[in-house]
Amino acid sequence: MGKKRKVTLLDFAFTDKEPRPIPRIPYYWMTDEELQSIHKFPYMNGERCPFEFSVRVGEEVYKFNGVIPKGFPWNVADIPFLLQPISYDKHSPFVVQGSLIHDYLLSRKRVLYNDWEMEAKGITPLEFKRITSEIFGYVLRYNGVPYRKAWLMAKFVDLFQYFIPTWYSLNVKEFDLG
């Protein structure tokens, strides 16, 4: 029996500017569709944010980079009701950056997975989802969340993705992600 190959996140960083979340404000003249979009995605990214991260696959290390576009909408974080008492408020500055990069990577999964040639590097789609959860936890720790709480929140995100795997792809249809 061969050795099991392990996929591990090594590091993550915003390389130029950090995200600047801007609340999307509903106005009386907006259409019902625009108001529903704001209700679903109450924030948008106010800065163009380049990022990079490294992943170890077995013995190989791969670097990936991308850019979160200015104006990218996201819902901050869906924290199930029962888990809210042991996690941060979804609008907490500790959570916002991590949820942005996580939601961006998942919304672009099909494109990024192919652009970054992840399959050729031996990373499966399920491992890519797990990497996005690890990045979420990594950014939480970077922003000062204690290790155990960040780990726990990242595990919640991972479980949520496992049970509702298509959530983000079903909800981000109105924003042209290129």
Regions found by a protein language model. Give the residues of each.
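Extended terminal accessory/targeting regions
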Residues: 2-178
